Regions:
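Short beta-strand-centered segment that lines the nucleotide-binding/catalytic pocket of NTP-utilizing
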Residues: 106-117
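Post-Walker A helix-loop "phosphate-sensing" segment adjacent to the P-loop in P-loop NTPases
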Residues: 98-108
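Recognition helices and adjacent regulatory flanks at domain boundaries
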Residues: 67, 73, 87, 109-111
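C-terminal accessory "lid"/substrate-recognition subdomains
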Residues: 1-77, 102, 116
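Catalytic cysteine-centered active loop of the rhodanese-like fold, especially the PTP/DSP P-loop
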Residues: 75-98
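Short loop/turn motifs enriched for small/polar and acidic residues
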Residues: 3, 82-84, 113
Length: 117
């Protein structure tokens, strides 16, 4: 799930990942009114080395932690990825994390709570 911190952390979140530390496409005029569903926004976010490194670190954490949740009997886990407004960075990362979870053999669903705000 992607979300914007300015609208509150989703109460159903089991894990909250923060991507506000990354460069914000909101401040790029041609990207401001687009979202992480648009490829040029994804390209902008992921063009920064710190975004690639942060994604790798989140993936490493999930590779370790997800089997532990399964072992404890958790059949569903809500991973909430937040940025300021919930339209650019969080959507990009929520999609990337869902792709990674699929590679690990899980069946993630993805929601973008604040994309239309």
């Amino acid at each position: 799930m992607s979300f914007g911190f300015k609208f509150g952390i989703p109460p159903e979140a089991d894990l909250v990942l923060d991507v506000r530390c990354l460069p914000n496409p909101f401040y790029v005029p041609e990207l401001k009114h687009k979202t992480g569903l648009d490829q040029d926004v994804v390209d902008f976010v992921m063009s920064h080395p710190e975004a690639q490194e942060l994604l790798k670190r989140y993936e490493n954490f999930l590779q370790y932690a997800l089997p532990l949740y399964v072992k404890e009997g958790k059949s569903q886990l809500t991973i909430a990825v937040g940025c300021t407004g919930g339209k650019h960075r969080s959507i990009t990362f929520a999609r990337k994390i869902a792709e990674y979870c699929t590679q690990l053999g899980y069946e993630p669903g993805v929601q973008h709570r604040d994309v239309k705000r």
